[in-house]
C-alpha cells in the first residue's frame, strides 16, 4: 500500500553527505542502545539508519572528489554529531529543542485572549491532559462579534480507561484487569461512553461556540482531509458520528456544551496495542446481578487501527489543514504545553479532582442492582448504598460491598 502521507511526517533537518558518513559510527553505537527502547522508536530508528548509513555510491562520490582519506570508523566532530542527532530525535518526537513550551502565564494569556490556535500537549499524563482541556474550554472567551474563537487541542495519553461523567463505572470496566495491565481509570468532565487510550492513540478536541457547534462537523472535516491525502484510507462516518474504516470503528467521540461554548473531543486509533485492550471493557461481575441505571451505556463496537498513519503524521496533517481552513486574520499559531511548565492552580485543582477516589467512585448516576438468587435489591447514589432490603448494608460504600460481596451475601 502506498504511503501518501509521508510528506506530512515531521522531518529531521537536512544533513550533508559528509556529515552523513561522519554519523555512521555514531548511529550504530546509538542503535545498540535503542534496541531495548519502547516500540514507538522503531520508525525513527529505521529512518536514521537509512539517513546515516552511506551507500557505496555516496562513498565513491566522496572519493572522486578527493575525499578518499575519510575513515568511516572515526568521527571528527563527535560532539557536534551527537548534538545534531539528539536535536533531530527530539524534534521528531516533539519533546525538545524545536518546541517552545509555554509557561503558565503564557498559557493563561493565550487562552483568555480572543483568537484561534492549535495546542499540542507534550505530556502523556491523562490527568494533566484532561485538566488542560478543561482549562482551555472554561477560559476561552465567547466572541461577542466577528469570528468565533475556535481552537484545536491534541494530546496522547499513556495507558488509561476513560469513562464518561454520567456513567456507572461498575457496568463499564473490569477494575481488576485495568490494575493488572497498569491502566489508569479516569472519569472525564464530559459525557459519552468509555474509551481506552495508549501511546498509539491520538486525542483531539475541537472547541467552538455553541451557535457554530454541530456534533458531526469536525469528524467530517478530518475524513475529508485524510481521504484527500490517501484515498486508500476509505474513512467514513457512521450514523452516530464515529469515524469508521471498513466497518471498524477507529474513532469515538464525546461532547460538552456549557457557557455558550462547546467542544467535541475524540480518539483516533493509529497504532494502539489492541491486544492489551482485550477484556478491559467487560466487567467480570456475577451473572446473578441485574442493573438499572439512568446513566449512559457504552455502545460496543469492533475496533481497529488505521495502521498507515503515525501519531505525528496525524497531528501534522490535521494541524496544517485546520490552519488553512479556519484562517481568518493572520496565521493560526501552534503552541506546546507540558505538565511541568504549562501548569497553574486551576489545572492542578482539576488534576486533583480527576485523581481523587471521590470523583472516580463516588460520583456518576444513581443506580440499583438486584442480586436475583439472594432476593436482594440495593440502591446506590454517589457511590453509597442508601436503600436496601437489608438494613445492615445501608451506608456502606458500594465499592467495598462489591469487592467483598461473598462475605455480605
UniProtKB/Swiss-Prot annotation:
(R)-lipoate binds at residue 249. Keywords: ATP-binding, Ligase, Nucleotide-binding. It holds the Pfam family LplA-B_cat. CDD domains: LplA. It catalyses: L-lysyl-[lipoyl-carrier protein] + (R)-lipoate + ATP = N(6)-[(R)-lipoyl]-L-lysyl-[lipoyl-carrier protein] + AMP + diphosphate + H(+). PROSITE patterns: BPL_LPL_CATALYTIC. GO terms for biological process: protein modification process. It is an enzyme of class 6 (ligase). GO terms for molecular function: ATP binding; lipoate-protein ligase activity; lipoyltransferase activity. SUPFAM superfamilies: Class II aaRS and biotin synthetases (SSF55681). ATP binds at residues 188, 193-196, 249. One of its GO terms (cellular component) is mitochondrion. Catalyzes both the ATP-dependent activation of exogenously supplied lipoate to lipoyl-AMP and the transfer of the activated lipoyl onto the lipoyl domains of lipoate-dependent enzymes. In the transfer reaction, the free carboxyl group of lipoic acid is attached via an amide linkage to the epsilon-amino group of a specific lysine residue of lipoyl domains of lipoate-dependent enzymes. This is Putative lipoate-protein ligase A. The gene is AIM22.
Amino acid at each position: 500500500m502506498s504511503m501518501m502521507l509521508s510528506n506530512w511526517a515531521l522531518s529531521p533537518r537536512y544533513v550533508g553527505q559528509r556529515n552523513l558518513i561522519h554519523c555512521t559510527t555514531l548511529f550504530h553505537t546509538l542503535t545498540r542502545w535503542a534496541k531495548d527502547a519502547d516500540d514507538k522508536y522503531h520508525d525513527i530508528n529505521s529512518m536514521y539508519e537509512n539517513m546515516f548509513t552511506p551507500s557505496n555510491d555516496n562513498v565513491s562520490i566522496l572519493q572522486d572528489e578527493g575525499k578518499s582519506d575519510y575513515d568511516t570508523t572515526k568521527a571528527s566532530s563527535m560532539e557536534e554529531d551527537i548534538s545534531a542527532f539528539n536535536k533531530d530525535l527530539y524534534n521528531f518526537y516533539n519533546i525538545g529543542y524545536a518546541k517552545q513550551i509555554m509557561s503558565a502565564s503564557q498559557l493563561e494569556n493565550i487562552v483568555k485572549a480572543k483568537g484561534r490556535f492549535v495546542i499540542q500537549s507534550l505530556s502523556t499524563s491523562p490527568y494533566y491532559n484532561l485538566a488542560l482541556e478543561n482549562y482551555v474550554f472554561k477560559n476561552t472567551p465567547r466572541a461577542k462579534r466577528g469570528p468565533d474563537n475556535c481552537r484545536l487541542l491534541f494530546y496522547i495519553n499513556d495507558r488509561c480507561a476513560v469513562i464518561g461523567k454520567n456513567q456507572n463505572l461498575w457496568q463499564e470496566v473490569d477494575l481488576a484487569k485495568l490494575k493488572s495491565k497498569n491502566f489508569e481509570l479516569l472519569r472525564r468532565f464530559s459525557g459519552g461512553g468509555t474509551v481506552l487510550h495508549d501511546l498509539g492513540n491520538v486525542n483531539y478536541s475541537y472547541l467552538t461556540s455553541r451557535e457554530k457547534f454541530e456534533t458531526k462537523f469536525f469528524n467530517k472535516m478530518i475524513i475529508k482531509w485524510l481521504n484527500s491525502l490517501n484515498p486508500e484510507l476509505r474513512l467514513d462516518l457512521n450514523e452516530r458520528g464515529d469515524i469508521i474504516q471498513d466497518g471498524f470503528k477507529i474513532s469515538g467521540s464525546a461532547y460538552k456544551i456549557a457557557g455558550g461554548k462547546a467542544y467535541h473531543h475524540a480518539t483516533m486509533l493509529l497504532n494502539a496495542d489492541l491486544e492489551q485492550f482485550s477484556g478491559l471493557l467487560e466487567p467480570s461481575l456475577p451473572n446473578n446481578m441485574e442493573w438499572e441505571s439512568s446513566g449512559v451505556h457504552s455502545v460496543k463496537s469492533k475496533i481497529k487501527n488505521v495502521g498507515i498513519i503515525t501519531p505525528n503524521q496525524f497531528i501534522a496533517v490535521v494541524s496544517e489543514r485546520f490552519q488553512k481552513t479556519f484562517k481568518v486574520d493572520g496565521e493560526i499559531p501552534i503552541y506546546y504545553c507540558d505538565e511541568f511548565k504549562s501548569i497553574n492552580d486551576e489545572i492542578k485543582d482539576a488534576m486533583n479532582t480527576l485523581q481523587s477516589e471521590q470523583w472516580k467512585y463516588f460520583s456518576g448516576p444513581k443506580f440499583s442492582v438486584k442480586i436475583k438468587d439472594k432476593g436482594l435489591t440495593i440502591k446506590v447514589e454517589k457511590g453509597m448504598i442508601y436503600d436496601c432490603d437489608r438494613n445492615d448494608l445501608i451506608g456502606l460504600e458500594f465499592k467495598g460491598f462489591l469487592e467483598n460481596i461473598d462475605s455480605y451475601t
